[in-house]
Amino acid sequence: MRQHLRIHKAEPNKGILDYSHLLDAPAGKHGFVETRNGHLYFEDGKRARFLGFNVAARSNTPDHETAKKMAERFASMGVNLIRLHAADAPVGEQPGSWSSCVNNPLLDYADGNSRKFNPEGLDRFDYFIAKLKEKGIYLHVDLIVAREFQPGDEMDYPGGAPSCIKRYAIYNARMIELQKEYAKELLCHVNPYTGLSLADDPAVVTVQINNEDSA
């Protein structure tokens, strides 16, 4: 007999479609992930396997209630790894655009540079990470993806920084300096909801220095 199953994007799966029991929460309970003989293992010797996808741009800074729902939804899908992708994206007005929210981006572009965090955006980012971790969802963290360098960043490009600038972060001295600064601030900042920095959190599986570095 054919039966209609309703799956709502804002609600966790239920019944036989709820795969959250497959996750081993909280993320990080078995220690850091490491490689051994071509496979992934946790520090305690348990084999590590991951299933996940991207959360991009403005989706990295949901409000607290939405963050809870997203974590529940992902866990119910059996997802145990989320890529925090393009959290450095510039602000944009359209919800469907490849951009951060105007009021709560991770990076604060308001002062004509891209060198500090927006307090509200950072709080949302931290809370989202904490909710994912609680559900047993691990993290892949991107560094430079869509960062839009501003005049105040003092880039050494005549007429301003070119588009799709991430490719230049491989060899441009000023960009390397700015990206080191960003990485240190992002990875060493202590999340008040977990009590750990990303650098010290075993829920972080991988850190990607440069997105699509050959693009």
Where are these regions (language model features)?
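N-terminal pre-domain segments of enzymes
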Residues: 1-30
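Active-site mouth of glycoside hydrolases
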Residues: 30-215
